[in-house]
Design a protein with these regions (language model features):
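Bacterial Sec-dependent N-terminal signal peptides
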Residues: 1-28, 500-503
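A non-transmembrane, solvent-exposed segment enriched in polar/low-complexity residues
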Residues: 20-176, 186-187, 191-216
Length: 503
């Protein structure tokens, strides 16, 4: 939880779309090489263009608009999309005059002609940059060959962090109630100063963590849209969910609800936060975190609490539809039953007419003509007797499958050698029986080799098989334990599940 502040926190050198805003920002930039310049602002993890000056004469850059600029950290950006410097905008800086020079001294020469607080902010940025250079210089002169060198560098880092912390505390105290003080406050992490001792005599890390988490969002105004228009808020938000919140989908959902409750529905910060959480957990690569996405859909999108988040109402419908598809497939959910046909029964199914049916109506007629026989041929997923069932959907012609299936064969054989009660319910996603049977024979697939011979299951929709292969692990009760994993993870995960079951 110790923070490392040795980064250039406001840019004197990066960059993007929106427009609108009585404001007048006049910047005199000596030796300016540009013919146009941009006024940009930060918003969560992105940067947007607010205005463009298309005529620069004698270094004079002017941005004007009929509406007020929203509170935030703004940047002067060159025509080559490089940031010259950052400055803040609040209610008192809608008419702002700045001057500097386009050189290595741009930060030192930067002055606000009509805003003392802006100058205090510029001094703060210069202080941070000076401290950063001091540390880098010390690091370059320290060879770091011995433990003594490392200790010296660590001591220097602690000293600089302390200096920055003291400067920031003083700045926040002296300018309390201002927008820029609130922005700098976002960098702060509230640590328990007098940590009590645990029973072992050491500092109680649990109490320290609980205090840190409880006070993490102190003095952060979730009703102020300007809270998200700076370079710090997104990092603070990301750090909270990656390093502070217990890494579990349920805990994450609870914390999202707490944060959303702090923001007022309909405000920009509310919309941005909800859109951010929705995208983050819809696209999460961490197994099980699609549960958070489903929670967001159920709690916000289905209840009208996401109204206005997206301009296109179809996006809301798509989000709900996607979440509803994932809901029965969440880790911990009972697996949807499947009724597949053995690969060796392909010719029998073909003789009944299943492969010749041209549409769903013909397929239905064929099924009902042969109901009794087909029902006897079905291999139900729910009937598989095993401590663990590996459910895999794949295709003979799929390049990735050709790499993954041999790995799965090895994993399965190794599990059998260890006397594990495991079976593989292998579903071929096409209907080219000869090709399937040939692959099975040539590669000696030791699985339950199946396919949807009666066109009965619609596994693509039921199991979200938008690409192949897709691998699930089910327990003896056919509850989903793992999903969308690589073949080389199968044995490791089953070993983990077995170890957990023995505890």
């Amino acid at each position: 939880m110790k923070k490392f502040l040795l980064t250039v926190v406001f840019s004197f050198s990066c960059f993007l779309t929106s427009a609108q805003s009585g404001y007048e920002i006049t910047i005199t930039l000596k030796n300016c090489p540009d013919s146009l310049a941009y006024l940009t602002y930060y918003q969560l993890d992105k940067t947007f263009i607010k205005d463009t000056c298309t005529s620069i004469k004698n270094g004079k850059i002017v941005f004007t608009g009929k509406s007020k600029l929203e509170k935030g950290i703004y940047s002067l950006v060159s025509q080559k999309k490089a940031i010259y410097f950052d400055f803040f905008i609040d209610d008192n800086t809608q008419k702002l005059e700045l001057k500097s020079e386009a050189s290595a001294n741009i930060g030192k020469e930067l002055t606000a002609l009509n805003s003392p607080l802006q100058n205090e902010f510029f001094k703060y940025v210069q202080f941070i940059n000076t401290q950063n250079k001091d540390f880098q210089s010390f690091r370059e002169t320290t060879k770091l060959l011995t433990k003594k060198d490392s200790l010296a560098l660590s001591k220097k880092q602690t000293e600089i962090e302390g200096s920055i912390k003291n400067y920031e505390e003083k700045f926040i105290t002296e300018h309390k109630g201002t927008y820029i003080a609130d922005v700098i406050n976002l960098k702060f992490e509230k640590l328990l100063k007098d940590v009590p001792k645990a029973s072992n005599g050491r500092p109680d890390s649990i109490q320290a963590y609980q205090y840190y988490k409880k006070h993490y969002w102190d003095n952060v105004d979730f009703k102020e849209d300007g809270t998200v228009r700076n370079p710090f808020f997104n990092g603070k938000l990301k750090r909270y969910f990656e390093s502070v919140v217990y890494r579990h989908p349920d805990s994450t959902s609870v914390e999202i609800d707490k944060i959303m409750a702090k923001a007022q529905q309909g405000t920009l910060i509310y919309k941005l936060l909800l859109a951010h959480f929705t995208y983050t957990y819809e696209t999460s690569k961490i197994m099980g975190y699609d549960k958070v996405f489903v929670h967001i859909s159920d709690r916000y999108f289905k209840t009208g609490k996401a109204d206005g988040i997206y301009d296109d109402s179809e996006i809301v419908k798509k989000i709900i539809k996607r979440a509803d598809k994932l809901k029965p497939l969440l880790v911990g959910s009972p697996a949807i039953d499947l009724f597949m046909i053995k690969a060796e029964d392909f010719d029998k199914m073909k003789a009944m007419g299943f492969e010749d049916a041209k549409n769903s109506e013909e397929m239905t007629n064929v099924f009902y003509k042969n109901t009794d026989q087909v029902n006897k041929m079905f291999v139900k997923l729910s009937d598989v007797k095993a401590d663990y069932t590996i459910l895999v959907f794949w295709d003979v012609d799929c390049g990735h499958c050709q790499k993954e299936i041999p790995v799965l064969v090895d994993a399965y054989n190794n599990l059998l050698k260890e006397k594990k009660n495991v079976k593989v319910y292998s579903v071929y996603m096409q209907h080219e029986g000869d090709k399937y049977l040939k692959y099975i024979a040539e590669n000696k697939l030791p699985f339950m080799n199946l396919y949807d011979g009666a066109h009965y299951n619609n596994a693509i929709e039921k199991y979200d098989v938008y690409s192949t292969p897709v691998i699930y692990i089910l327990d003896k009760n056919k509850v989903i334990k793992a999903k969308r994993i690589d073949a080389n993870q199968v044995k490791t995960l089953i070993d983990v599940f077995e170890a957990e079951a023995k505890k």
